[in-house]
Every structure is written in structure tokens, then in C-alpha cells.
Design a protein with these regions (language model features):
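Start-transfer (signal-anchor) and selected internal transmembrane alpha helices
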Residues: 1-23
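Juxtamembrane segments of multi-pass membrane glycosylation machinery
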Residues: 68-71, 75-107
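Membrane-interface transmembrane helices that cradle and orient dolichyl/undecaprenyl
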Residues: 121-128, 163-181
Length: 182
């Protein structure tokens, strides 16, 4: 496969993944996304109060279960709240704010696919192998689903992919400063 065809296929797969994930994130019902309603309490709290929640606060705690996702790491909720705050400048629509919050997962999934292609390019001499790796990871049904709703998982997969990529680069360059910093 020549270089031009490879990059065309790679960018089309990345764009296709983004379109599928973003499109699904727009139409996915909250009740079909596990715990999303409860996870959404965190970015909603951040946007409305302009402060980080304490997990013991009533407004972020589930009354039936008695716990809150604010007791867990919530970096993705902070990122989602930025997208929600930007969206709230234009509209107060609950659907638009939900889609804005889901954008964190969509972009994390898309970023993961980009990094998987970079990993494939580092590991394999043949471009087809890198392309196949991207196809396998990017179009696993569960991965596409994780990239469509508010959760920590898609961002966690993205950061692990980044760690693996820079680890591979570091091993190839004897961990020069550039590869250690990223």
C-alpha cells in the first residue's frame, strides 16, 4: 500500500469513527447508557455552581444507592463541564448540554484511534498492519459504545494508549527527554 492510500484510508477511518460516535451520542437515550444520569450530576453541578462537588453533597448523591460519582476521580466530568459551559452560552437545551458532555467521550475515543494508528506505525513496517490495528480497535462495538456517552472509560483507554505509544517511542530512543515528556 502506498503512503497516499494509507493516509487517505487512515483519515477516513478516523473521520468515520468520529461521525459514528458523535452521531450515536446525539441520538442515544440516557436510559440506554449505564449510570449516565448519575454521572451527569457532576458536570451539571460544576456548570451551575462553578465549583467542584464534594461526594457527600445531596445534590450529587443518588438517594437510593447512597453514593456519588463525585467520590471517584472525575477529570472527565471537569472536561465535560467545559464543553457544557461553552454550549450553555448558546442554548440551555438539556439535549444540547448532554451532547456537549458526551463530546469528552467522543473525542477521547477518536484520540484513542489516532494513537492506535501511531502505535501501529511504530510497531509495524507494513502500513496495512497499522491500518488493521486501527480497524480492530476503532470498530469494536463496545469501544464505539463507550465513546458515545458520559463515562470515564473512554478517557482511560485514551490515556493508556498514550502511555503505550510513548513507552514504545521511549524504548526506541533510549528514553530521550522528548519522548519522556511527550
Amino acid at each position: 500500500m502506498n503512503k497516499k492510500d494509507y493516509y487517505w484510508a487512515k483519515y477516513m477511518l478516523i473521520f468515520g469513527f468520529f461521525c459514528i460516535s458523535f452521531g450515536t451520542s446525539i441520538f442515544l437515550k440516557t436510559e440506554h447508557a449505564p449510570d449516565e444520569a448519575m454521572r451527569m450530576l457532576i458536570p451539571e453541578y460544576i456548570v451551575s455552581h462553578h465549583t467542584l462537588p464534594n461526594g457527600m453533597e445531596e445534590s450529587v448523591r443518588h438517594p437510593l444507592w447512597g453514593f456519588s460519582y463525585a467520590l471517584y476521580p472525575y477529570l472527565t466530568a471537569i472536561i465535560s463541564s467545559v464543553f457544557m459551559a461553552i454550549t450553555s452560552l448558546f442554548t440551555k437545551s438539556a439535549a444540547a448540554l448532554l451532547t456537549a458532555a458526551r463530546l469528552t467521550s467522543v473525542l477521547s475515543g477518536t484520540g484513542t484511534l489516532i494513537v492506535v494508528f501511531l502505535i501501529g506505525e511504530e510497531l509495524f513496517e507494513r502500513r496495512e498492519s497499522a491500518l488493521l490495528g486501527g480497524i480492530f480497535v476503532g470498530f469494536l462495538p463496545q469501544f464505539v459504545f463507550l465513546s458515545c456517552y458520559v463515562n470515564n472509560d473512554s478517557f482511560a483507554v485514551f490515556t493508556v494508549a498514550l502511555i503505550i505509544y510513548f513507552w514504545i517511542r521511549g524504548m526506541k530512543s533510549a528514553f530521550c527527554k522528548k519522548d519522556c515528556i511527550g
